[in-house]
A protein has these predicted regions:
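Active-site- or binding-pocket-proximal scaffold segments within functional domains
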Residues: 1-181
Length: 181
């Protein structure tokens, strides 16, 4: 059913145009609503090294609105993605007019968010997103949220592969902090 629901809004082609030298994409780890399934950007190059340089897709904690700029309550999460995007643009030497940003940017990887699916977005059902990449594709805020002992219940990304990666890389640190508290 989600295929039919999304048919009208699906990207025709997710491969970037050859005239695009660099593309950045902030992706929500915790989005579970099928109507907001992720469309990853595909590089136009066939060379692996060039592909990694053309398209940078980084996964952030939170749902679709949390990463893309949802409610004020979740702005700490979206501010993290916004700051990352601004840093990418500035690193390319492009001018960035920050006067268009209507609030101070205060990233907070520990900000709470509601990951439940409500009407009408629950009509198509829920499922974790398909993850492509490795731990290097996770923004630092994911790791910081994972090890933050003040989040109750402890952060558990919606994508099982990411949970396993974090457990392998940071599990000992998380357990060590819990024991020392």
């Amino acid at each position: 059913m989600d295929e039919k629901f999304n048919e009208r809004y699906r990207f025709y082609d997710s491969t970037i145009n050859p005239t695009i030298e660099k593309a950045f994409h902030a992706v929500a780890i915790d989005e579970i609503r099928k109507v907001f399934d992720v469309t990853l950007i595909r590089p136009h190059s066939t060379h692996i090294r060039q592909q990694k340089e053309q398209v940078v897709q980084v996964w952030f904690p939170g749902g679709h609105g949390c990463v893309g700029g949802g409610s004020q309550k979740e702005s700490g999460l979206s501010d993290g993605a916004l700051l990352w995007m601004m840093e990418q643009v500035e690193a390319l030497g492009l001018a960035l007019d920050k006067s268009y940003i209507q609030h101070e940017v205060h990233p907070n990887c520990s900000a709470s968010f509601d990951n439940t699916s409500k009407w009408p977005f629950n009509v198509a059902g829920t499922a974790p997103r398909q993850f492509e990449g490795d731990v290097s594709n996770l923004h630092e805020s994911v790791k910081n949220r994972w090890t933050d002992l003040n989040i109750n219940p402890p952060y558990k990304p919606a994508i099982p592969e990411i949970q396993m990666m974090l457990e392998q890389e940071l599990g000992a640190l998380r357990k060590k902090e819990i024991v020392s508290v």
